């Protein structure tokens, strides 16, 4: 009975560790697009979105994972 409980506990711990590792791998790294998944930027990053214009006509929105405390200004 103790062996069965111990085995079940080990399996639960292993599955939790695998889920956590999978969640960490799923994050979007710095300067990669996050338009479709804005909440998936890696830790320390935020998804910042911009409207794209071509010849004065809006062509959609694009989002990128950038550092949280960094502000970009147009040139």
Curated annotation (Swiss-Prot):
Task: Spell out the subcellular localization from the entry.
Answer: Secreted
Report what the protein is called.
Answer: U6-lycotoxin-Ls1f
**One GO location term (cellular component):** extracellular region
Post-translational modification, as annotated? Contains 4 disulfide bonds.
- Propeptide part(s) removed at maturation, as residue ranges: 22-25
Q: Does the keyword Nucleotide-binding apply?
A: no
Its main subcellular localisation, reduced to a broad class, is secreted
- Superkingdom of this entry's organism? Eukaryota
Q: Which Pfam families match?
A: Toxin_35
Q: Where is the signal peptide?
A: 1-21
Name the protein family. Answer: Belongs to the neurotoxin 19 (CSTX) family. 06 (U6-Lctx) subfamily.
One example of the protein's molecular function in GO is: toxin activity
Task: Name the tissues where it is expressed.
Answer: Expressed by the venom gland.
Sorted alphabetically, the keyword list is: Disulfide bond, Secreted, Signal, Toxin
